[in-house]
């Protein structure tokens, strides 16, 4: 029991064992993960820079998009650098407090990601259903408060799960079969009763994911009713195209999230562990990687802004 702090049942550190059963191919698995992370960082920073520089994108919709990009960067950066160190250099040890901190940030940022998608759905709803009041409803003050409350909600709901995990006794060992510190992955190696952790995790998922999905569903129901009532086919097409990128972002976020959540709580014995670990990594990587691409392809204003940016750079180089 050398991994314990004296007589305490709190370990000094944990060992993140990577992807169980696939240790021999850790290096090969790291290449697609590293590629996706590089695309995510480049794409999201590029999108934020574009929105900051182009005055045509200084509208609530794109402010929320910049907030989504910022959240995406934080979400994937909370795990991927450490995961790559595990896969590349076999550096598996993580301090107990660092593990709890990583767990806190992972769940806070994933909760914030869901919240921002919900805010973007409300933004689309106001823009399509109440176009004349759009500018007066979504002021800079309202946007800032909404973003802050979304972050605060994640923090306040995740903090208890961190303390619930910290209180557990770890007498079975300190090896976690995962690439990062996830709430239930850490709790499951405890020799204590983790029922409270599991129930609280389910409550948080319902409070965040359930509430956000309900708001998104109501928003899109109102949008659909408003669009169907439009007399012009072009207007209907324009309204639908406005929501396409956001709908893709919702699918990319919630499908792997639900898979990861339900396999953790209900499918632990039916889903192979290595599949669960891979999906848990893709769950944090897929949205940050694909969101800039989806919004770049599907959103006309973003495409035009990219073209203007490169044309401006080309003109400046010619003048030089």
From Swiss-Prot:
Gene Ontology MF terms in the entry: G protein-coupled receptor activity; olfactory receptor activity
Membrane topology (Extracellular): 1-27, 78-101, 163-198, 261-276
Database matches in InterPro entries: GPCR_Rhodpsn_7TM (IPR017452), Olfact_rcpt (IPR000725), OR51/52/56-like (IPR050402)
Cellular component, GO, one term: plasma membrane
S-S pairs: 99-191
Superkingdom in the source lineage: Eukaryota
Cited SUPFAM superfamilies: Family A G protein-coupled receptor-like
Sugar-bearing residue positions: 5
Keyword Kinase annotated: no
Subcellular location: Cell membrane
Entry function: Odorant receptor.
Protein name in UniProt: Olfactory receptor 52N1
Native organism taxonomy: Eukaryota, Metazoa, Chordata, Craniata, Vertebrata
């Amino acid at each position: 029991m050398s991994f314990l702090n004296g007589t305490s049942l709190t370990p000094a550190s944990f060992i993140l064992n990577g992807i169980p059963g696939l240790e021999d191919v850790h290096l090969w698995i790291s290449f697609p993960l590293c590629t996706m992370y590089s695309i995510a960082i480049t794409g999201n920073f590029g999108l934020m820079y574009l929105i900051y520089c182009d005055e045509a994108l200084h509208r609530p919709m794109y402010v929320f998009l910049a907030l989504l990009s910022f959240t995406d960067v934080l979400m994937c950066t909370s795990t991927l650098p450490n995961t790559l160190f595990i896969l590349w250099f076999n550096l598996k040890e993580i301090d107990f407090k660092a593990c709890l901190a990583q767990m806190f940030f992972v769940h806070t940022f994933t909760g914030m990601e869901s919240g921002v998608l919900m805010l973007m759905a409300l933004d689309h709803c106001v823009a399509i259903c109440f176009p004349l009041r759009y500018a007066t409803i979504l002021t800079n003050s309202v946007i800032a408060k909404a973003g802050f409350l979304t972050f605060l909600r994640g923090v306040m709901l995740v903090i208890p799960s961190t303390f619930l995990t910290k209180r557990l006794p770890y007498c079975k060992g300190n090896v976690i079969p995962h690439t990062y510190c996830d709430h239930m992955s850490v709790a499951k190696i405890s020799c204590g009763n983790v029922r409270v952790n599991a129930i609280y995790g389910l409550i948080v998922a319902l409070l965040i994911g359930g509430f956000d999905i309900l708001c998104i569903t109501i928003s899109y129901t109102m949008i659909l009713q408003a669009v169907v009532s439009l007399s012009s086919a072009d207007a209907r097409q324009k309204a639908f195209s406005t929501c396409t990128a956001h709908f893709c972002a919702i699918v990319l976020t919630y499908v792997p999230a639900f898979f990861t959540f339900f396999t953790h709580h209900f499918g632990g014995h039916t889903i192979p562990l290595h599949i669960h670990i891979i999906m848990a990594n893709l769950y944090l990587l897929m949205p940050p990687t694909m969101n800039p691409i989806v919004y770049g392809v599907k959103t006309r204003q973003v495409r035009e802004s990219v073209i203007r940016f490169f044309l401006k750079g080309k003109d400046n180089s010619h003048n030089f």
